[in-house]
Amino acid sequence: MATWSNLSIQDGASPLMEQLSFFHDDHTMVVLLITVIVGYALSYMLFNAYTNRNMLHGHLIETIWTALPAITLIFIALPSLRLLYLLDDSVDAMITIKTIGRQWYWSYEYSDFMDVEFDTYMTPEQDLENDGFRLLDVDNRTILPMNTEVRVLTSASDVLHSWAVPALGVKIDATPGRLNQGTFTMNRPGLFFGQCSEICGANHSFMPIVIESTSVNLFIKWLSKMI
């Protein structure tokens, strides 16, 4: 989750989010390099009192400033297309959960395990424990095993919502009358927080999501208590 004074993106907890982080870092360096080069060229021409007569008409320079951006865009686009493919790639998931967005809480269904169902509401500030997170904790956490491919089926019962967990690189629109899906794999244990990412009314800011990544044994024990 995002922590105090952290100005960067969250640490990835899934292979997909790690790839997105690498993509962000690489292309941030490209953007900084372009900014420095263009800024230096503009400053040099602005404060230079001399005129190069050979530069008054487009010759070699026009070819250069057309070819270099084109090559740069190609190197940026290729990793981006690969990530877009991975984001939409659908694999054979071992566990499927259903999330239904409602005003203003989430409903979950584990239909693979005798229809385990529950609702999650934000924990009020007066009910938080000492180690709780304000506006992020819920009364029922969503427990999932790590190192397991999980498929999320998302819909809504009233208005548009969006099920988003940044640390997992997942953002799925919840649309009434439609069923959207996404997949992810958590590669480490922990608590991963998210929120509704589509403005859905007065209490839009109070629809947190909490995913608890555990071992398979602890997940089975939790399921046995829920059934």
Curated annotation (Swiss-Prot):
The keyword Translocase applies. Binds a dinuclear copper A center per subunit. One of its GO terms (biological process) is ATP synthesis coupled electron transport. Mg(2+) binds at E198. It is an enzyme of class 7 (translocase). It comes from the Eukaryota. Residues 49-62 are mitochondrial matrix. Keywords: Copper, Electron transport, Magnesium, Membrane, Metal-binding, Mitochondrion, Mitochondrion inner membrane, Respiratory chain, Translocase, Transmembrane, Transmembrane helix, Transport. It is a multi-pass membrane protein. Cu cation A2 binds at C196, E198, C200, H204. Gene3D superfamilies: 1.10.287.90, Cupredoxins - blue copper proteins (2.60.40.420). Pfam families: COX2, COX2_TM. The chain crosses the membrane at residues 27-48, 63-82. Its cofactor is Cu cation. GO terms for molecular function: copper ion binding; cytochrome-c oxidase activity. Its EC number is 7.1.1.9. It catalyses: 4 Fe(II)-[cytochrome c] + O2 + 8 H(+)(in) = 4 Fe(III)-[cytochrome c] + 2 H2O + 4 H(+)(out). Cu cation A1 binds at H161, C196, C200, M207. The keyword NADP does not apply. GO terms for cellular component: mitochondrial inner membrane. Residues 1-26, 83-227 are mitochondrial intermembrane. It is found in: Mitochondrion inner membrane. Component of the cytochrome c oxidase, the last enzyme in the mitochondrial electron transport chain which drives oxidative phosphorylation. The respiratory chain contains 3 multisubunit complexes succinate dehydrogenase (complex II, CII), ubiquinol-cytochrome c oxidoreductase (cytochrome b-c1 complex, complex III, CIII) and cytochrome c oxidase (complex IV, CIV), that cooperate to transfer electrons derived from NADH and succinate to molecular oxygen, creating an electrochemical gradient over the inner membrane that drives transmembrane transport and the ATP synthase. Component of the cytochrome c oxidase (complex IV, CIV), a multisubunit enzyme composed of a catalytic core of 3 subunits and several supernumerary subunits. The complex exists as a monomer or a dimer and forms supercomplexes (SCs) in the inner mitochondrial membrane with ubiquinol-cytochrome c oxidoreductase (cytochrome b-c1 complex, complex III, CIII). Belongs to the cytochrome c oxidase subunit 2 family. This is Cytochrome c oxidase subunit 2. It comes from Schistocerca gregaria (Desert locust). The gene is COII.
